[in-house]
Amino acid sequence: MRARAVVVLVAGLLIPAGAMAAPTPAPTTRGVDYQIVPPAPRDVHRNANGPDTLFLNRCVGGCTVLPGGNDARTNHSSIPTTTANLSEFPFSDDDWNAVVACVTETYQPYGVDVVTTEPASGDYVEAMVAGTPDQMGLDATTLGIAPMTSDCTPQASAIAFAFAGNHGGQGYLLDLCATVAHEAGHVYGLDHEFDCKDPMTYLVGCGQKYFLNVAAPCGEFDGPRNCRCTGPTQNSHVKLSAVLGVGTLPAGPTVTIPYPADGAMVDNSFSIFGEVAEDRVLDRVEFWLNGWPWKTEDGDRDRDTYSYTAPANLPDGVIDVEVRAYNDLELMGVDVVTVTKGEACTSAATCLDGQQCSDGRCAWPEPTGEIGDACERDADCMSRKCGSDGNVQLCTDYCLLGIEGSCGDGYSCLAAGADTGVCWPSELTVGEPTGCCSAGEGAGGGPAPWLLGA
């Protein structure tokens, strides 16, 4: 069997110019270096296929890196050609703590412990956050470097380098955090992504970066390209979840309804505004009225305010207005206000077909159908999503593609779009799928078709 080759990938993340907060300004250009070297043997790990400890080393008193092979336990690296000595992290303790906290948050959704004390035993990935590239014989534009296997499998015990002394300018700590996460990502098998919100990017801006649950094209500065191992796109969140396991998921978006005000009297076709704050990326925003989703709008990275005009046929009465926002991890944030349109209902006679009047509100009965239960329309399902594979119609819900256990026992997450998955009974997914259906929008109608991939 031929040995896998290791590709050494250099991060050239640019840092905006500004008031200097570091000893030297960051480079304004970057170079890319690919170096093929033999891989080190890998052991089997308890967390999926990869290591579960990421050691951040500030190199107090300096670090010595020995050439040859990749083994964090013995400070060996395939990157330098001779023994290299890296100077220690050049900034304050507060700065170090900020970088550690940022990297920890970035890797929080995965089964890896970010530590600052070298493990006494076992395999681990190390990120040396110290020194400058010239101390390893590298080009001055290099902000970080790490080995990556040519087949994108994770390495057991390798060193990634984030040259802290080469980071400066406005926002240098956030950029240094991104470089650390980026270089460790290469050790875990991630390629570069052409998406400025993901740590695996070379693109600048977009604030703090997170490993995103999106199918992103790969690439550096010159536009998208095919990924080394995954075809036209890469999903960094799915990759790390498979390599490291699932960690602690963050909170969902923060949602505020500035209008209408809670307790307000509203007219026909009243406007609803929702303000959404989300550090990751927003997948969608839903507008619910008295327990039913009347409108779903795709999330926009450059937008934080969403609006909806209530339909003219919305019955008079007390109305609970909800704005729900979901990020790329399907984590939800919600805000609720209660308003009154006209007079509160006193019977179902003034409500829409199938609705009941309760406590002055016109609303459809709360559905009882769980995922996998038979359904005829969205209103039969607690998820408000009735799907069909062409043979049967069942209640379903959104799920995270590629994440094991996203749907629970007995169910699989099937593709219903580039980044969209739905839960379907595993016993019905054997062989080639025939298609499935999505929830209809509005007053509880039947589903509209979507194609489920294998």
Regions found by a protein language model. Give the residues of each.
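Bacterial N-terminal signal peptides
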Residues: 7-17
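Primarily auto-inhibitory N-terminal propeptides
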Residues: 21-85, 90
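Metzincin-family zinc-dependent endopeptidase catalytic domain
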Residues: 36-39, 44-53, 59, 91-193, ...
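Long, low-complexity serine/threonine/glycine- and acidic-rich segments characteristic of extracellular
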Residues: 251-343
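Secreted, cysteine-rich disulfide-bonded mini-domains of extracellular proteins
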Residues: 342-435
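Extracellular Ser/Thr-rich, low-complexity/disordered mucin-like segments
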Residues: 433-446
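A cross-kingdom C-terminal cell-surface attachment/processing module
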Residues: 446-454
